[in-house]
A protein has these predicted regions:
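Alpha-helical promoter-recognition and RNA polymerase-docking modules of transcription initiation factors
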Residues: 1-98
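Internal acidic/polar
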Residues: 100-110
Length: 110
């Protein structure tokens, strides 16, 4: 069953569809977490686990709003910027990686 079909079932009140959708999306969440961690140079297992947990919470939040419009694209396309943004914010706040990243690179703010 596709993500979009499970999402429609969840919106119609099928709580088991949400569980199946979450299980189906775990690989996608892990992929976004890996990309986010690598962007900031911190891809240890503990950080990846934390990012996956943050991603799961953001997934729940995004799905519960009911704002996803299937006609505008796939569910993963809709979710990706939300998950990535949540993970970036988590890294910046909890790991202060933005400062390390800026000072290790040649970038100097004006």
């Amino acid at each position: 069953m596709t993500n979009e079909e499970l999402y429609r079932q969840y919106l119609s009140g099928d709580t088991e569809a949400f569980e199946r959708l979450y299980l189906q999306m775990q690989g996608f969440i892990a992929s976004v977490a890996k990309d986010a961690a690598q962007s900031f140079g911190c891809s240890d297992k503990e950080t990846l686990d934390e990012l996956c947990a943050e991603g799961a919470l953001e997934l729940c939040k995004c799905l519960s709003t009911g704002e996803y419009d299937e006609e505008r694209g796939k569910l993963t396309t809709y979710l990706h910027p939300f998950l990535r943004g949540k993970m970036y914010r988590y890294l910046i706040i909890n790991h202060k990686v933005i400062f390390d990243y800026l000072f290790k690179s040649s970038y100097m703010p004006v």
